[in-house]
A protein has these predicted regions:
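GIY-YIG nuclease catalytic motif and its immediate N-terminal context
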Residues: 1-39, 89
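Boundary/linker segments flanking structured domains
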Residues: 1-11, 70-107
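A positively charged, amphipathic N-terminal helix/segment that binds anionic biomolecules
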Residues: 4, 16-19, 26, 45-47, ...
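Conserved short loop/helix modules at catalytic or binding sites
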Residues: 31-84
Length: 107
């Protein structure tokens, strides 16, 4: 019997988060793992930091992490939402209204 890969749920929880250093802001979204939302945000933040320190990315967020250091950033959950589509809609709306300087696009 061949096992089929299990389809990922499309309605799991996601969180919209804000990273800030001084007046520079980044808005992002990630899924909530089986653990707590705080752990999921920490995992995502550490991925941003790892990418900034080990890859030669010139994305605005990576440059800011290298310039100011990871400890200078305030990392916070903005909203927890059920469903990927809803989370991305909120992220896009926040990007339009907040106009964060560290996001690489302005969806």
């Amino acid at each position: 019997m061949i096992k089929k890969a299990r389809k990922k749920r499309s309605d799991r929880n996601h969180l919209v988060y804000k990273l800030q250093v001084g007046k520079l802001v980044y808005i992002g979204v990630t899924h909530v793992d089986r653990g707590s939302p705080a752990k999921s945000l920490r995992r995502r933040w550490l991925k941003h930091v790892q990418r900034a320190m080990t890859e030669d990315r010139q994305w605005k967020l990576c440059v800011a992490i290298r310039k100011h250091g990871a400890d200078a950033f305030n990392v916070e959950i903005v909203k927890i939402v059920r469903g990927k589509t809803a989370a991305h809609e909120i992220e896009r709306e926040l990007i339009r209204t907040v106009k964060p300087k560290l996001n690489t696009d302005d969806r």
